[in-house]
Every structure is written in structure tokens, then in C-alpha cells.
Amino acid sequence: MTRTINLQLPKRTSTYSSNFLKPAGCPKYEFVEGSKKPSRPRNKFIIMRTIFHNSSSKIVSAIWKHSPDQFQKYFQLLAEFEQNWHKHNHSPAAALTDAEAFRVIARSLHPQPRVIKRRQQKKKVKMLCGRFSRIEDVFSSL
């Protein structure tokens, strides 16, 4: 003879009356009946990583603070190797002058060597043209 037990779990929302009701590693999105669900559920590793992230960071921080200088110099050396290997200088679009940005827009609208899809052209123009408030600003900067 088997017995079935019907349990009702509390609904997950962004506010909780106590920590007891909050599931461990609860995501930051709201999960209530009728709301839009996330595109994919988290797998078992992601849930475990979410739960243990805070405590593991504290442990690693304590190890780092109490470690000898030689230990920290080793990781400093690894960081320098990676920095030399990477060789990437971050240059955001906001750092461009208006004239340079206009040239980038013009080149993206009329590419010579390769064919760009129309959707990609529109995306580039929207991204770069948002910085010009009027057409006079574009031509006055040239």
C-alpha cells in the first residue's frame, strides 16, 4: 500500500517574509503565476555555483590575505603574462571624435570589399548615430 503526500510549495516572489521561505540560490527574477518565465531553467551545476559563490569567495579572500608574498607574486606574474599575451586595448565608441564616428558610419553604409546584410547596417547606424542630435552637428564637425 503506497501513500501519496500532496505538498504545496510557497510561491516564489521577489519579497519574502522570512529567509525560511526563500529557496537556496533563488534567482533574482520574479517567478509568479502569470509572469513571464525565463527562457531556460538553470541546471544543477549553475544552482550549486549560485549557492556556493558567496562562501567560496570569502574563503579565497581569507587565503589571499594570509598568504605569503611569494604566493601572491606568483599570481602577479601570471597576470602580467596574460596581459602581455592579450594585447587588446579597449577603445569604446564614445572615445571617437564626431568626425571619426561619421566616417565609421559612412563606411558601414557603403562597404566596398564585403557585403553586409541590411539588418546589420541598420544596427550599426542606430548604434553610432544616436550621438548626433542634428544633421548640422555631423557636418560642422568635419
UniProtKB/Swiss-Prot annotation:
The keyword Nucleus applies. Keywords: Nucleus, Transcription, Transcription regulation. One of its GO terms (cellular component) is nucleus. It is found in: Nucleus. It comes from the Eukaryota. This is Putative mating-type transcription factor. It comes from Eremothecium gossypii (strain ATCC 10895 / CBS 109.51 / FGSC 9923 / NRRL Y-1056).
